[in-house]
Amino acid sequence: MQFNYTIRNPQMLRTFLQEQGYSKNTISAIKHNGALIVNGQTETVRKQLQKDDKVEVHLAQETASHNLIPFEKTLNILYEDEYLLIVSKEAYQNCAPSREHKHFSLAEQILGYFKQSRQNIVPHIVTRIDRNTSGIVVVAKHGFLHHLMANIHIDKTYLCVCFGEMKAHGIIDAPIARDPASIITRQVNPHGKQAITKYRRLDYISNYSLCEITLLTGRTHQIRVHFQHIGHPIVGDDLYGGGHSCYKHQLLRCFKISFMHPILSLIHI
């Protein structure tokens, strides 16, 4: 992957790269397995740049972890360019391999797609969602882009079906911490990290509410913990009090997302 720049002010190449968001690790990788080219000549980070110099940054080629075993299965692709891939994930699928589910993750499915489409790329999941939550996932096509995305605010909107009749709208402001009795679950705790969830009820039928949810913070299991906390657990979420005989996963979906693309323009899906 290559990025091109025109220099506006004299400065050292290393300084310029740092200003563009290249981390020390990325710069080190470029030195060993990439290239820095100024006006057609290969240079080092100590090169003194002048106004109007043309700089090419060739990122280091990445190698996928041996733990990622690619497999081919049709992806639900919502958006793709040379920098990012945005897909819709099914429920019952991890974003990345875990101790309990070592293979058939979304990352491995995407790696299979890249190989099938002859893209020598390692996927970097930007917006992870829980195994049994479905919906939109953003993927960076290089670690550098993943690094840039870490500093970009992403607006995510979810849909869920929960038990009981929710109020027409509201905000749940309750801090969340790890459950000391579990390595998986979280709980509302006054000593936890701030967590704020905004919701709007869209429909109510037969003791079930359909809600649209916006996260103002991004804690692990935030929606699930908050809805349990107010007495309206998500249908199918047996981990947080919403077990249901007809649904074996929580009825929770990330269905809308928007953010400023790190290279191009606004993305809204």
Where are these regions (language model features)?
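RNA pseudouridine synthases
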Residues: 1-267
